[in-house]
Amino acid sequence: MFFEIALIGTTASGKTYIANTLAREFDAVVLSLDSLCVYKEINIASAKPSQDDLASIKYFGVNLLSVNEHFNVELFIREYQKAKEFALARNLPLIIVGGTGFYLKTMIDGLSEKTLESKSSLNNDEIYALLLNIDPNYKIEKNDTYRLKKWLGIYEQTREIPSEFLKRTQKTGVLKDIEIYELAWDKEILKKRIKTRTKEMLDNGLLDEAKILFSKFDHKLKALNSIGLKECKEYLDGEISFKELENLITIHTTQLAKRQRTFNKKFQSKALEFDKALAILRMKFSIEK
C-alpha cells in the first residue's frame, strides 16, 4: 500500500544504500533530494546511484538537467508530485532521500512568494551585518550565500523586513505528517567513511569526470564549484598536489557533514544507528505493506 517516509543524514551516511535496498525489497519508489544528482553530466562527484540502480528502481529527481541549466526548490516540489502520483497509482511506498535538507524543509513548510535574488555586489559579511541590523530574527548562517542573497533580494524589492515578508506570504507545504528517519553516526567514524569515500571517488575517475566538465562548461557555474569538483579544478590548474587534492575534498566534505548535521536538527526525526536502520525500516515496511 502507499505510504511515504523521508530518510535523511549527512553525506556518506549510507542513505542511498538503505533507500535502494528497501526499494528493491518492497518495490518502493525513490525521490532523490540532492542538488547535484539532478545534473546529467555529474555522476561521480554527486555519488549518484549507479546505472544498475537507476535501471532497476523507479527514481525521481535524478538526471533532469544539464549543468548550465538553473533550478530551484520548485523543481523538487514538482518531482515529488510526480513521484507521489506514480506511487499512489500503483499502491507503492515512496522513499524521499537526500542530504539537501533545505529542500525537504521547504516541502514541509511551504514556499513563500517569489522574489528575485539580489544582484548586489555586497559580500556575505556585509549582507550579514545588514541583516543583523535590520532583521535579527532571521536565522541564517554567515556562509549561506543563497539565503543571504534571497534575504537581500526581498529587502531590496519590498522594503519589508524579510522575516515578516516570508511569514506573511508563506504557502502550505506539500508534505504533511511525514515520518522522518535520520541515519546517525559517531563523528569520528563518519570522518573515516568520508576519507574512504573520497579515495574511492578519485579511484573511480573523479578527475576524468572533472576534466570533461571543465572542457565543456564554464568553470564558474555553481554546479562546477561544488565539493569534489572545485578542488579538482585547482589540481588540474597545477595549484595543488594530488595529496592536497584528496585532503581538501575530505576536509571540505567533513565540514559539509557538520553543517548538514546542524541543519537536520530542524526536523523532528527518529535517529537510527546505521547498523540497525535496515532491520528497523524493514519491519516498518512489512507492517505497512
Curated annotation (Swiss-Prot):
One of its GO terms (biological process) is tRNA modification. ATP binds at G9, T10, T11, A12, S13, G14, K15, T16. Its cofactor is Mg(2+). The keyword Ion transport does not apply. Residues 34-37 are annotated as: Interaction with substrate tRNA. It holds the Pfam family IPPT. The keyword Cell membrane does not apply. This is tRNA dimethylallyltransferase. It comes from Campylobacter jejuni subsp. jejuni serotype O:6 (strain 81116 / NCTC 11828). The lineage of its organism: Bacteria, Pseudomonadati, Campylobacterota, Epsilonproteobacteria, Campylobacterales.
